[in-house]
Amino acid sequence: MRVSESGFSLRIRLVLRGTRGEPTLIEGMKADSLECVPAPTAGIMKHGLEGGGEIQSLAVDLDHGKHDAKAVLKDGSLDPRPYFSKNFYELDEGESVVYEVLVLTRRQCRWRLAVQVRSGETTGTVHVDDVGAPFLASSVVWDRSGQNLGPYRTCLVSDNETGYIDRGAGCRQ
């Protein structure tokens, strides 16, 4: 089980590597295959994902818009324009780029990342998931009485064998 306790967010480190003889252009990134339900009342915890190389920070809001990756501004807000509408990245064969994607939600959502790429005249989408399963991001609601719906904490949950549950230290305020 993976968790971020940074308040409505999850960070995923994504390493993309060029594998073709000609350059590959990264043209877009967004959350895809999105399925959301209200947040559960629970808590789970796990270490973050790792990657190497220079890191480009992006954010995806699963609760608003078209779920395109956007730049995080210095004040912590999101640029209203999709990041790749003005920041294409060209990968040569063997070259890598690392994106740290901050995922925001107040619900529980299953999703994958869809990276739009072009190599020569060929375009396509590379789907990124959690070892074959969709990512599961969730905000946790600790009080469903109707009087107080906060505080929220955000968790990312993965069903793969590297996860674990910590019953004493889950997403608590």
Which residue ranges define each predicted feature?
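Short aromatic-acidic-glycine turn motif
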Residues: 33-45, 120-127
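A surface/extracellular/periplasmic glyco- and lipid-processing/surface-interacting theme
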Residues: 24, 37-49, 55-57
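Short, hydrophobic/aromatic beta-strand segments
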Residues: 22-30, 40-43, 70-72, 112
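Intrinsically disordered, low-complexity Pro/Gly/Ser/Thr-rich segments with frequent PxxP/GP/PP motifs
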Residues: 48-107
